[in-house]
UniProtKB/Swiss-Prot annotation:
Native source organism of the sequence: Yersinia enterocolitica serotype O:8 / biotype 1B (strain NCTC 13174 / 8081)
Identification of the protein by name: Bifunctional uridylyltransferase/uridylyl-removing enzyme
Cofactors that this protein relies on: Mg(2+)
GO BP annotations listed: regulation of nitrogen utilization
Domain of life, source organism: Bacteria
Domain ACT: 711-792, 818-892
Regulation: Uridylyltransferase (UTase) activity is inhibited by glutamine, while glutamine activates uridylyl-removing (UR) activity.
Biological role stated in the UniProt entry: Modifies, by uridylylation and deuridylylation, the PII regulatory proteins (GlnB and homologs), in response to the nitrogen status of the cell that GlnD senses through the glutamine level. Under low glutamine levels, catalyzes the conversion of the PII proteins and UTP to PII-UMP and PPi, while under higher glutamine levels, GlnD hydrolyzes PII-UMP to PII and UMP (deuridylylation). Thus, controls uridylylation state and activity of the PII proteins, and plays an important role in the regulation of nitrogen assimilation and metabolism.
InterPro entries recorded: ACT-like_dom_sf (IPR045865), ACT_dom (IPR002912), HD/PDEase_dom (IPR003607), HD_domain (IPR006674), NT_sf (IPR043519), PII_UdlTrfase/GS_AdlTrfase (IPR013546), Polymerase_NTP_transf_dom (IPR002934), UTase/UR (IPR010043)
Family: Belongs to the GlnD family.
Pfam families xref list: ACT (PF01842), GlnD_UR_UTase (PF08335), HD (PF01966), NTP_transf_2 (PF01909)
Annotated region described as Uridylyl-removing, given as residue ranges: 352-710
Amino acid sequence: MSDNHTEHSVLPAVTKVIPEQPASPATYLDSELNCPELKQRLETFQSWLADAFNGGISAETLIAARSDYIDRLLGRLWTFYGFDDVPETALVAVGGYGRGELHPLSDIDVLILSKQRLNDEHAQRVGQLITLLWDLKLEVGHSVRTLEECLLEGLADLTVATNMVESRLICGDVALFLQMQKHIFSDNFWPSPKFFHAKVVEQQERHKRYHGTSYNLEPDIKSSPGGLRDIHTLQWVARRHFGATSLSEMVDFGFLTKAERNELIESQSFLWRIRFALHLVLTRYDNRLLFDRQLSVAQLLQYQGEGNEPVERMMKDFYRMTRRVSELNNMLLQLFDEAILALDTNEKPRPLDDEFQLRGDLIDLRDENLFVDKPEAIMRMFYLMVRNQDIKGIYSTTVRRLRHARRHLKQPLCNIPEARKLFMAILRHPGAVSRALLPMHRHSVLWAYMPQWGSIVGQMQFDLFHAYTVDEHTIRVLLKLESFADESTRPRHPLCVELYPRLPQPELLLLAALFHDIAKGRGGDHSILGAHDVLEFAEQHGLNSREAQLVAWLVRCHLLMSVTAQRRDIQDPAVIQQFSAEVQSETRLRYLVSLTVADICATNENLWNSWKQSLLRELYFATEKQLRRGMQNSPDLRERVRHHRLQALALLRMDNIDEEALHHIWSRCRADYFLRHSPNQLAWHARHLLEHDSTKPLVLVSRQATRGGTEIFIWCPDRPSLFAAVVGELDRRNLSVHDAQIFTNRDGMAMDTFIVLEPDGSPLAQDRHPIIIHALQQAMTRQNYQHPRVRRLSPKLRHFSVPTETNFLPTHNERRTYLELIALDQPGLLARVGDIFADLGLSLHSARITTIGERVEDLFVLADKDRRALSIETRRELAQRLTDTLNPNDKL
């Protein structure tokens, strides 16, 4: 088995066609050293870089070529401006330019170094030189310092010190440059231990900005964890401590093995190639692989496939490579700290057993060949880590041995009986995820244990919904499940924290989470394929039939509760009965709701809000009640209507309301109105209607969050365009509608309820209530309905293709049609849908709005003008109108 798991992570081969390189700037005549001429020469050189790259020349070669070209250009200009005659002055490349790494849009950072402060004439020449470079559109960063100023600035600023560590002489006074180098590498200037620890802290802070993972779907090639900066950090540390100027020299000093050097070189080459391609696609410096750039970069790198396949293949390679860099970076920095900086430590290791020992709080091998001789010992190490809370991590040399052993595995670890016992023992232990599964994933042991895991490592989905790759998402699901055992999680997830301790076998839930997305990217239904995989895994690991079937059901149905809660009418008893029939037992319901909440939270940090929480709670308790009542006993709807009315009346009697007037209002309402509102809502509506001038429209906005959002109730004469007018106004006010209940009384008055949220998922801000009420009153009374103006899609959304789909869901209700609409999220969508309903004379009874990244998946409950389900002809016409209206086009 492979250690690196990147065998197919090699960029596509291309045929090398080497174009002729433009003339060196060293040959330019004085008469050619003017801005127009030099600009033309630079454009020619940049075009040559692109042609050479497209012709198959390596990024390494071209990066060095650009650095050399700029060296010669600056050297020629140095002479042209007379600096050869200025004593004790040097032109020094620093930063990435100092390393000789110049991508097409890279900054060119230079230091003009002098023994003494430059006089006015020489300073003026420097200004002329830099101005020319800026006029040439080169991104030049420069500093002019004396040697003393350099050292003082470097002592005060880590970034300046780092730039000086990788400085390189371009031209000028060699002795002065060497004098600076001597000071930089002395013990008085950032001693190696101090420099090392400062760079580690700097890296940790940088990683925090990217949430500690390179798996963000729009990563920064340079700065994300596992990116080029992590390789630079290793080089800086080795350069400062050993004086090593290359990865190969780091082998000579014993900092790297040859295999590790080769891995870093391969990783660096891969990242350079992607960064080089990105710079060719862009016109301004940036290192972020944003969605709108990914396809162009993938095509430039000759990734093949239909639609977004080139992007997904490129990004999978990228994520796998950054995983490798992250592991090497962490291991080597730890090794440097433990084995090099701490050479004089007298602390002796403490034996844990015959195979392992503890160095401080890190587990270490007692026999360096153990993992190769007994691969099951790898699992034994993680079992010790989950059992012994004194163990905080793995010692660096043991990580090195682990990586070596992975490379030499002859079979998956799960084929070894002892390893299987240990794996199941790990799952059954509290803290299994954070103390064992997470480090197993970081060190590719999960992949080495179960081959299925390898297919999802680095697997991305080109959308705005999934914030992480499939493997990273799965680990986050597992961590979220583990958090349900922690009482501190109760405020955010009260239901799950209440239920998790009541699960008879939490390890089965962890196993289901491990496999719930295991089949993503294979084609076919990943839930069904994953259920098949986990059944085989369960049988191999000795689970009995009941346990295996439960885990397989959880994997197969892991989306069921989320879909039912968010995209179905859960106030319809038939929906609850159908869902309950699938769940079958309260135990399975507890497992499923825990997995569902963890899955939503781990998909995207912005997805979980009080609205979703309220939907899942409502579905959970309705299902629990149905299961306890028995599947054959459906609720009596007439009794529910009667119960709601009586409870609402009891609340209103506390206010001494006019019951005759109340009867007059309620007598005009249909049964659905009482069925779909709680007694508190009914009382709230009635209280205000009784006091309201019936000649004017009424708008109510709840002060307390309702089902996680803000409830808006409207009462006014109904008209075909009312829904479109209201949702259009809410959209203009930057509010998202998540639920709508639409009722028309027997007297033609609309009594509609909308649940809305702010863009961040919170209820409507209190100070916005008066503005929204006034805006809706205006929209409700406006005689001439204004069709929503079609606004442009956001730049991010333009790069996603979501064909409009209309599905009419099966139902036994002869008076209603259930329409599921899937479309690209776009401004004014609900209002345009409402327009279509009005044009076709359709009545909307309820709407459930779900936005999933760049797509909406909405449910509408409709009837025709005779209050019956839509005919086949009307369905066909409705589907066509929706498709024609909502499919993205160039006008958006």
